[in-house]
Amino acid sequence: MREAFICDGIRTPIGRYGGALSSVRADDLAAIPLRELLVRNPRLDAECIDDVILGCANQAGEDNRNVARMATLLAGLPQSVSGTTINRLCGSGLDALGFAARAIKAGDGDLLIAGGVESMSRAPFVMGKAASAFSRQAEMFDTTIGWRFVNPLMAQQFGTDSMPETAENVAELLKISREDQDSFALRSQQRTAKAQSSGILAEEIVPVVLKNKKGVVTEIQHDEHLRPETTLEQLRGLKAPFRANGVITAGNASGVNDGAAALIIASEQMAAAQGLTPRARIVAMATAGVEPRLMGLGPVPATRRVLERAGLSIHDMDVIELNEAFAAQALGVLRELGLPDDAPHVNPNGGAIALGHPLGMSGARLALAASHELHRRNGRYALCTMCIGVGQGIAMILERV
């Protein structure tokens, strides 16, 4: 069977909500890593790219109407290169890599770019049309995160718990204490700060150059969401606003962020022809559904499924990149998979609690980080997995080349 390989990848810094990248449209943001991949790989013939596949979770504003195609054109790729946008909410970026890998394995392509983008700062407010003439019953939604235009049948059958409420549900079900969550969040901040100061994160990043109305140029080189000075005392002092006697706080949850990432996925033959060096083989991918109110546990069945497909066990994984939507759900996943809370090979360079979680981009970031870390550790296998709103999980296994 034909195999699919990650040959290169790059991402923007992750911007804080309303921060350094908030002035950049989603389509312009996605164009940045696409353009950089061509610069980094001068032998690559862009005319040979079969498709560009990007994940994006919102698609209600400037990211509407197929942001992948628009970003492809804005990046200067040939008009002959097609682009498509997929939406599996938080899992969109990882799913994009899976789509690219399946195309190669099926013989439907040899060279693709896959990744994801999200500008949560620029997510618009939306309002539906009136149900009847002259109606005064209008409802407006903030599309940054969460439900909008809810189907009443969905609400009746499955509820409309917010993302923090689903994390509260997981914490209650599995008896995950506030203390354990805050300790996990602190480790995320500490590991991320160390990775940033040592230059590990810089290996993944292309700086974003911005010019304001006065012509002043600013170069954004680093992720800006992390808080390296965080202490356990500070985390313990934060309020839990989502439920009486709750445990979910701003400190043990991921951020609302902006960012984009893109990776080159190629067959072995095309990689050689284009002067590309395979770094990781995409072994297998799986998705799974869970109860929407417990969406944070989605990585558990998805991971078990992908391990079964690959004929591997969780103990074969040298690196695990688990998206930290919330400390509660990350801990729930680790415990259900039989892993310790502080496993050194799980998110060794921190995670979304510190880095942030630009929804459509995050899965691509996980794969990029995992492929780098496998080479640093001389490991063989990596697992990338994440929970998904409305009750899903996604998981992918990579093998170092």
From Swiss-Prot:
Question: Which terms are listed as keywords in the entry?
Answer: Acyltransferase, Transferase
Q: Does the keyword Transmembrane helix apply?
A: no
Q: Which GO terms describe its molecular function?
A: 3-oxoadipyl-CoA thiolase activity; acetyl-CoA C-acyltransferase activity; transferase activity
Give the induction text.
Activated by cAMP receptor protein (CRP), integration host factor (IHF) and by phenylacetyl-coenzyme A (PA-CoA) that prevents PaaX from binding its target sequences. Inhibited by PaaX.
Pfam short name (any one):
Thiolase_N
Catalysed reaction per UniProt? succinyl-CoA + acetyl-CoA = 3-oxoadipyl-CoA + CoA; 2,3-didehydroadipoyl-CoA + acetyl-CoA = 3-oxo-5,6-didehydrosuberyl-CoA + CoA
What pathway is it annotated to?
Answer: Aromatic compound metabolism; phenylacetate degradation
- Describe what happens without this gene: Mutants are unable to use phenylacetate as a carbon source.
What is annotated as the active site? 90 (acyl-thioester intermediate), 357 (proton acceptor), 387 (proton acceptor)
- Alphabetical GO biological process terms: 3,4-dihydroxybenzoate catabolic process; DNA damage response; fatty acid beta-oxidation; phenylacetate catabolic process
Enzyme Commission number, as recorded: 2.3.1.174, 2.3.1.223
EC top class, as a word: transferase
Job description of the protein: Catalyzes the thiolytic cleavage of the beta-keto C8 intermediate 3-oxo-5,6-dehydrosuberyl-CoA with CoA to yield the C6 intermediate 2,3-dehydroadipyl-CoA and acetyl-CoA. Besides it catalyzes also the last step of the pathway, in which 3-oxoadipyl-CoA similarly is cleaved to acetyl-CoA and succinyl-CoA.
Per the record, the similarity remark reads: Belongs to the thiolase-like superfamily. Thiolase family.
Q: What is this protein called?
A: 3-oxoadipyl-CoA/3-oxo-5,6-dehydrosuberyl-CoA thiolase
Q: Which organism is it from?
A: Escherichia coli (strain K12)
